[in-house]
Amino acid sequence: MDIKIQCEQAVKELIETAKITSGNILVVGCSTSEVVGSKIGTNSDPDTAQKIFDGIYNVLKEKNIYLAVQCCEHLNRAIVIERCALPFAEPVNVIPQKKAGGSLATVAYNSFNNPIVVENIKADAGMDIGDTFIGMHLKAVAIPVRLSIKEIGNAHLTCARVRPKFIGGIRAIYNEELL
């Protein structure tokens, strides 16, 4: 199956399963090296990144969900996102590149209308393509989401949603819709 189509299907399934809604943030970490069958960090591929970006971003944009793209470890896993998603965020001064930030972060930075790079966020859901470890950018409490699509290209796909923390103990009553 085509990489763009895999990404479209995966993000649609995640939106439905995780109940992601307008205004929410979806963080994506991606190793294009892993997608093309190489070891993470060794074969960054801008063309593959463009397919992944197009597959995910087009679905999110029509649902008014913000895309946050995690940079690689060389940029401390910083986040590329549209400024309007985080209007009061403090940006850091860096422009992602293929070998410093990664191909997907570079494509996102060059594709967004008004991109900023920030050190961290707390997203509502996430997609990890190629075991890049996105957990640091998810709200507590993260819950794994199992999708029918297990891989994007050759890369392992892991997804998560979040739920609010339970507080109050045995006497508390919880909102079932937030689980």
Locations of the language-model features?
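Solvent-exposed alpha-helices and their adjacent loops that cap or buttress functional pockets
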Residues: 18-20, 100, 146-151
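Ligand-binding beta-strand-loop-alpha-helix segment within the catalytic cores
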Residues: 63-125, 130
